[in-house]
């Protein structure tokens, strides 16, 4: 799942995930309300979460998701790569933290592949959400 208010950045994330994981099912949401509805109906295994969402921010949304769905892996993506945000992400129980600039880095896709394998999916031909 991709939770990002910028439709253009959401498309970049989806494009790159589909390029690396062609059969991955990618759910998207533009804000916390939409994300929560889709989490309850679609049960994603992995969430890319923007911090700067309209309304409820991504850190608070992460805390709420982890309270209800502790097994969901949440990767925080932000333009604000500062120690304060990293510490807040840890406090709010995010699993990983990346700057948006690092998204196209192969390390992010290696991490996603490793998460999918741990979740029991074939990362090359996954039907993971």
How would you name each of these model-derived features?
Residues 58, 90-96:
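As written
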Residues 54, 82:
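The feature encodes the CheY-like receiver
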Residues 7-27:
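Two-component/phosphorelay signaling modules centered on CheY-like receiver
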């Amino acid at each position: 799942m991709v939770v990002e208010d910028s439709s253009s950045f959401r498309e970049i994330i989806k494009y790159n995930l589909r390029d690396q994981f062609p059969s991955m099912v990618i759910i998207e949401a533009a804000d916390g309300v939409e994300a929560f509805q889709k989490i309850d109906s679609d049960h994603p295994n992995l969430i890319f979460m923007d911090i700067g969402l309209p309304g409820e921010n991504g850190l608070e949304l992460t805390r709420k998701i982890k309270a209800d769905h502790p097994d969901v892996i949440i990767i925080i993506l932000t333009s604000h790569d500062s120690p304060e945000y990293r510490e807040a992400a840890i406090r709010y129980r995010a699993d990983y933290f990346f700057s948006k600039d690092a998204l196209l880095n192969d390390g992010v896709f290696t991490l996603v592949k490793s998460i999918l394998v741990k979740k029991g999916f074939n990362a090359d031909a996954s039907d993971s959400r």
